[in-house]
Amino acid sequence: MKQPTEQRFDYVKIGLASPDRIRQWGERTLPNGILVGEVTKPETINYRTLKPEMDGLFCERIFGPSKDWECWCGKYKRVRHRGIVCERCGVEVTESRVRRHRMGFIKLAAPVTHVWYLKGIPSYLSILLDMPLRDVEQIVYFNAYVVLDPGNSGNLQYKQLLTEDQWLEIEEQIYAEDSELYGIEVGIGAEAIERLLQELNLDEEAEKLREEIIESKGQKRAKLIKRLRVIDNFIATGSQPDWMVLTVIPVIPPDLRPMVQLDGGRFATSDLNDLYRRVINRNNRLSRLQEILAPEIIVRNEKRMLQEAVDALIDNGRRGRTVVGANNRPLKSLSDIIEGKQGRFRQNLLGKRVDYSGRSVIVVGPKLKIFQCGLPREMAIELFQPFVIHRLIKLGLVNNIKAAKKMIQRGDPQVWNVLEEVITGHPVLLNRAPTLHRLGIQAFEPILVEGRAIQLHPLVCPAFNADFDGDQMAVHVPLSLESQSEARLLMLACHNILSPATGRPIVAPSQDMVLGCYYLTSENPKAQKGAESYYSDLEDALMAYEQGLVDLHAYVWVRCDLEVVTEQPDDKPIKTETSEDGTVTKYYRHRKVRETADGKLICQFIHTTVGRIIYNKTVQDTLVA
C-alpha cells in the first residue's frame, strides 16, 4: 500500500546540491533505454502546431504530456494506454499534472559560480578561499588570472592575482629558449575557482584554523572564527565546496513557468522562460565555439556571458546590469519568485488559503463579554454550513444534502434557528496579521450579528494590537472535537489575561473606555435637572434618569442602608442634629445618617451622581455574576 506523503519523509532540509543530484532530479531512463532530461534547445512551442518542441523548454518527452493520456504525436490516446512510451515520439502516456513536478537540466559547456555564494552576505566563496571578494569577482568575470601552481618561480605565490599584461610577460619568460621556469599554472573564470575549491582540504584547514585562533586576538581572531564556522558547517553537512560552482543547472517544471495563449493569438509567458532561453543560447554558442577551436579571447568572452546569464536566472540584478523585458521591466528570476511577501514561501507554503475561514473588518462590540465575538450571519452560515446541513438532516427537516443547501440558499427562518443551535458552545479562532506572539490568535464564542463586520470586545485589542480604523481579522473554525476543546481550554480570550512576554496584564481598559468611565463618574457643579432630589433606592434613581427627570451628572440623595466604606481615615460628622423624638441626624461630607438615641441605624442617604450609581452597579453586577 502506498504511504501518505507526510509519512514518506521525516523533515525537509535545504542544502547544497551536487551536480549528480541535480542530474538525478531531471534525468530519467525510458523503457527503450534512452536517457532523457537534458534541455538542449531554447525553443518553447512550435508557432504553427502550437505543440512543445522536442528537447526544448516545454518538451513532452522530458516533462510529460501536455494533455492527459495522450502522446505528442497522437498515436496513443485514452487512459487504457497508461504507462506506455510512444515508440515514435518517446513521450510517456500519463497524466498532464506530472508537468508540475518533473524537472529537467542544462549541462553547461563551462562551469559557472552560484551568484548567491559569490555576492551573498557573507560571501562564502571569499571566506572559504580566504581571498577578498573583489579579487574573487575579478577572477570569476575574467578580469584577472589567479596562480594555481607557482611552479619553481620565486616571484609567484599560490592564489596571487595577475593582470592580462603580467601573465603575458610571464608567458614570454616561460617560452623563452633559455627559460628555467616550469610548472607554473594560472587559471581564470569559474574553472579556476572550482580548482581552488577542489584543492581545499577542509579537515586540515579546520585544524590549522583552531591552532591560529588560540594565538590570535581582536579582528583577526573574529575573521578566523567566521571562516572556521563555515568550514565546520561544510564538514557537518557533508557538502563539497566545489558544489558552489555549477556544471549542471536544474530546469524547473514547465507548469511552474507557464506559457498561455491570449485572446488575440499572442502568448504570455513567465519571465523564467526568457532567462532560461538566454542561458541555453549562450551555452550552445559556447559549445560550438569550443568544437571549432575558436580563439581563446572569443571563448573567454562567451564564458563570461554564460556566467552573467546564469547570474540573471538565479538572482537578476544581484550583480551587473539587470536583465529587462518589455517596457524596461526587470525579469523575475528564481530568487524573486522565492523571496518576499509574494514569494513561494510566505505566499504559498507558510500562508496558505484554508477552508472554513473568513475575513472581515472589525468594529467595536461594547455589549459583548470578553470571550465573545460578533460573527455576521452571512459569514456564519457559510463557515458552519456542514454542521448546519448535518443538523437539518438529523432533525428531519430535509432528506439529503442537496435539499439542505437549497434551504440555506432560500434563507429559510428555520435555518437561522439551527445555526444558533450549532454555534452555541462552538468556539471560533480570530487572528490578526501579523501574528507576532501567541496572543495574536485567540478563541471566542460567536454571537450572530447583523451587518458584515466582525464585532470584537475592546479589551482584547491590545493583545491583537488592533484598533477600529479599518483593521481586518480572519476567522477560523476548529472542526474536530480535540481542536474545539483545546481552543476552549487554552485559547479562550478570558484565559489570556497576562502577557506571556512580561507576565503583566495585557487586558487593560484604554482610550474610549477610560474616557467613558471618566465621563460617567465626573461631576458638573452647574445647575442640573433634578439636582438634590431624594430617591428611595438605586433603582429609583436610575428609573428617574431613564425617564429624563434627572441629569447624569446631577448630585442626588439616594437611600442606601448598607455599610459605607470610605477612603478617609477619620470620617467624622460635619454637623449633628437631634430631633424631638430623640433621633440623631449626622451630616457627613457625602452622606446623611439617621440613628436612634442608642446608635441604631434608621436610614442612610448617600450624596452621589447618577453616573456614579450606574458605574458602581455595573461593577457590582459583574463581580456577583
UniProtKB/Swiss-Prot annotation:
Class in the EC hierarchy, top level: transferase
Binding site for Zn(2+): C71, C73, C86, C89
Gene Ontology biological process terms in this record: DNA-templated transcription
Residue ranges of the TM segments: none
MF GO annotations: DNA binding; DNA-directed RNA polymerase activity; magnesium ion binding; zinc ion binding
Keyword Nucleotidyltransferase in annotation: yes
Catalysed transformations (reactions): RNA(n) + a ribonucleoside 5'-triphosphate = RNA(n+1) + diphosphate
Pfam families, alphabetized: RNA_pol_Rpb1_1, RNA_pol_Rpb1_2, RNA_pol_Rpb1_3
GO CC terms, sorted: DNA-directed RNA polymerase complex
Keyword terms, alphabetized: DNA-directed RNA polymerase, Magnesium, Metal-binding, Nucleotidyltransferase, Transcription, Transferase, Zinc
UniProt keyword annotation of Nucleotide-binding present: no
EC number: 2.7.7.6
Cofactor(s), names only, from the UniProt record: Mg(2+); Zn(2+)
Cofactor-binding details, from the entry: Binds 1 Mg(2+) ion per subunit.
UniProt-annotated binding residues for Mg(2+): D467, D469, D471
Subunit structure: In cyanobacteria the RNAP catalytic core is composed of 2 alpha, 1 beta, 1 beta', 1 gamma and 1 omega subunit. When a sigma factor is associated with the core the holoenzyme is formed, which can initiate transcription.
Protein family (similarity comment): Belongs to the RNA polymerase beta' chain family. RpoC1 subfamily.
HAMAP family the UniProt entry points to: RNApol_bact_RpoC1
Function according to Swiss-Prot or TrEMBL: DNA-dependent RNA polymerase catalyzes the transcription of DNA into RNA using the four ribonucleoside triphosphates as substrates.
Protein name (database record): DNA-directed RNA polymerase subunit gamma
Recorded name of the encoding gene: rpoC1
